[in-house]
Amino acid sequence: MIIEPKVREYICTTAHPQGCAESVRNQADYACKQGMVNGTKKALIIGCSTGYGLASRICALENCGADTLGIMFERQANGRRTATPGCYNTAEFHRLAAEKGAYAKTVNGDAFSKEIKDKAIELIKKDLGKVDLVVYSLAAPRRTDSEGKIWSSCLKTTGEAFTEKSLDLRNNEIAEKTVEPATEEEVLSTVKVMGGEDWADWIDALKAADVLTENAVTVAYSYIGPELTYPIYYHGTIGTAKQHLQKTMSEINQAHPDVCAVISVNKGLVTQASAAIPVVPLYFAILYKVMKKAGNHENCIQQIARLFTQKLYTPTGFRTDENGFIRMDDYELTPEIQEEVKKCWKAVTTDTVKEYCDIDGYWEDFYHMFGFRYEDIDYTQDVDADIEIDGVVM
């Protein structure tokens, strides 16, 4: 079929296999150029098929030469429908790993479930013995817990209603947006989905099965952002969940003294999830413009390659702040960058969006997530959307 992008609201419902493969190759090429470090040898990447999880898997391979087991929850092609981008990304990653003689298998299923945890443990025992790194990089709208209860996350404040400028990405217009406060049940539900409970469940299960090496490292990803976005993000339902994740880090370290749990606080980037959060897309679009002008903007792979080579695996150990977090948002939150962002925020209107916002860069990142807008790909060509992925366990 000829595959074109079909965007509805904030989601692209198609993905291009050749474009996704190009994306993975580009990321691998960049990571490879950053050099090798004495890091992970056998890694489990939970949420391995897109974004930070995919970048982590690529860096484990390219910067550490690691064997990797991944967990994803993706839909394969079905007749007239393409697969989700994570399927195509994973197919290309498996191919790259095979080229390097590295082990790569991926379990496709719900990472929140006991069944997938059991399957991962079975594969680790059979193929890897033990893992020394566990990356937790899940982003999901809902979670079914061990008792069968379904929890759903929401994007709301936790105090009063909040009104602020927002960017409508459908028409590039600036308008005020009001976000209503969440109920206690909605806050709890968001914490259940996006907090640290499942991260702890994974580490408990892996530890009980004796598939973690001594002094194994586990990394979870978080975002804090600037005060500008606190009401909707860090002081909102998502931020409450992220604070629970931070609390979980301490609990894992206390419960398992021979496991080192750490949180990497990352910079703001375009994702499918972030596009739907009120206020945040405008902040990101301004941030992109300001940081690119300053010369310190990082995309996903640039950030995770720096994490692996300069912060996580160093001769002197982790580089953390006073809270024990690895700060990959260090460039974003410098006073100079934030001061410039605030100036642009105050000045931007619908008429001056392109002057103050990197709209083109925002959309380029968005389309790249789905394998579109790569110069080397001929999108007029007929391609097979249904591809076989060696090494995927359903």
Model regions: which residues?
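Class I SAM-dependent methyltransferase Rossmann-like catalytic core
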Residues: M1-M36, E186-L188
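Canonical Rossmann dinucleotide-binding motif of NAD(H)/NADP(H)-dependent dehydrogenases/reductases
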Residues: D29, Q34-F73, A77
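Rossmann-fold scaffold of SDR-type NAD(P)-dependent oxidoreductases
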Residues: I46, V131-A139, S166, V217-S222
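Glycine-rich phosphate-binding loop and adjoining beta1-alpha1-beta2 segment
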Residues: G65-A104, D110
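A glycine-rich helix->loop->beta "capping" turn
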Residues: K105, K119-G148
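The beta1-alpha1 cofactor-binding region of Rossmann-like NAD(H)/NADP(H)-dependent oxidoreductases
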Residues: N108-A120, G196
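Catalytic loop of short-chain dehydrogenase/reductase
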Residues: S152-D258, V265-Y288, K292
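C-terminal helical subdomain
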Residues: E251, V259-S264, P281-V392
